[in-house]
Regions:
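Transmembrane alpha-helix boundary signature
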Residues: 35-43, 68-79, 97-101
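Helix-coil boundary and interhelical linker segments in multi-pass alpha-helical membrane proteins
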Residues: 7-16, 68-80, 126-138, 186-197, ...
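Structural signature of hydrophobic alpha-helical transmembrane segments
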Residues: 16-30, 75-90, 134-149, 195-207, ...
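Alpha-helical transmembrane segments in multipass membrane proteins, preferentially the mid-helix core
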Residues: 92-96, 126-129, 150-159, 181-188, ...
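Aromatic-anchored, glycine/proline-accented short structural segments
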Residues: 143-202
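Juxtamembrane helix-loop boundaries in multi-pass membrane proteins
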Residues: 1-4, 40-65, 82, 100-126, ...
Length: 295
């Protein structure tokens, strides 16, 4: 989430924020990879559980974002790693479907974190569409649009009719991510975007954003935990989607609508910066608190 937000701040002229955030994201990614290599039994145990398994897709998503950063210095290597990340993510989707869908879906663990696995692969078409082979980029877009369309009605029904366990509470915020990824990817790749489809996807973005804002008091009513990270990426990618939608509407002659959407994006930047700042501060407190106890 912070890495995506740093890209937005770079667009506003704040390059240093992007550099610092991407370096930090690189360190975090290396730590996660180190954990998998050094403690494979722990990673394997987590992967057997539905919700943690769905979140493992975050590793390839961060990799894709970092490829868009490092391509300025090593374009060939960044492209290879990006394509590899897409392929690994695709394999992860297949394994996840086999483990958690084909044998029957358990409603207690059917939560919005599934979209991290299902639609997270679309990070590649948001940040690096030009680096992907055209057929791969198109396949990712078609998959993302189809799986979101299929899954979201069931997810809305599930959230409306069944209580989400406290441990999975913050995963509810992830509903903003898939529609935002679909919208941003579609506008990146479509030569002549459909006004109806863009309008429909942006309506989903607005509805999801409203859902999160309504839920914020619930999300922050509990003590800080790693699950708060579920708030970060959806909020950040929502800004990207809104900015792209604003540019599309303006370019299509809908200046008033484009202006309104641009102002909504401004509110999103304001709110997302506050949320991500609070979450990062919470993680720093956990880190230094653990260090003090160890000392």
């Amino acid at each position: 989430g912070a890495a995506t937000l740093s890209n937005i701040y770079q667009g506003l002229g704040y390059d240093w924020i992007r550099h610092l955030t991407m370096w930090a994201a690189t360190a975090v990614l290396l730590c996660y990879l180190g954990k998998i290599i050094l403690y494979p039994s722990v990673a394997k145990g987590e992967y057997k559980n539905t919700v943690p398994a769905s979140l493992y897709a975050g590793i390839t998503m961060v990799t894709m974002i970092l490829c868009s950063y490092y391509k300025d210095w090593a374009p060939g290597l960044a492209r290879i790693i990006l394509i590899a990340a897409v392929c690994i993510h695709a394999v992860h989707i297949l394994v996840f479907l086999f483990n958690n869908v084909f044998g029957g879906v358990k409603l207690d663990t059917f939560v919005p974190s599934w979209f991290v696995t299902f639609n997270g692969i679309m990070v590649s078409t948001v940040v690096g569409a030009a680096m992907l082979p055209p057929f791969m980029a198109k396949a990712v877009l078609v998959w993302g649009l189809c799986i979101y369309t299929i899954t979201i009605p069931f997810m809305v029904w599930r959230l409306a009719t069944r209580e989400v366990k406290p441990a999975f509470c913050h995963t509810q915020a992830i509903v903003l991510a898939p529609c935002s990824l679909c919208l941003a990817s579609y506008l990146n790749l479509a030569q002549e975007p459909s006004m109806a489809l863009v309008g429909s996807l942006f309506s989903c973005v607005l509805a999801s954003l409203a859902f999160i804002i309504i839920k914020l008091p619930v999300f922050f009513a509990v003590p800080f935990a790693p699950g708060f990270a579920g708030l970060t990426f959806p909020m950040a990618i929502g800004i990207v989607a809104s900015n792209k939608a604003a540019a599309f509407f303006t370019g299509a002659g809908q200046e008033t609508l484009g202006y309104a959407v641009k102002q909504i994006a401004g509110v999103q930047i304001y709110l997302t910066t506050a949320i991500i700042g609070m979450v990062l501060f919470g993680f720093l407190k956990m880190l230094f608190g653990a260090g003090n106890k160890a000392g």
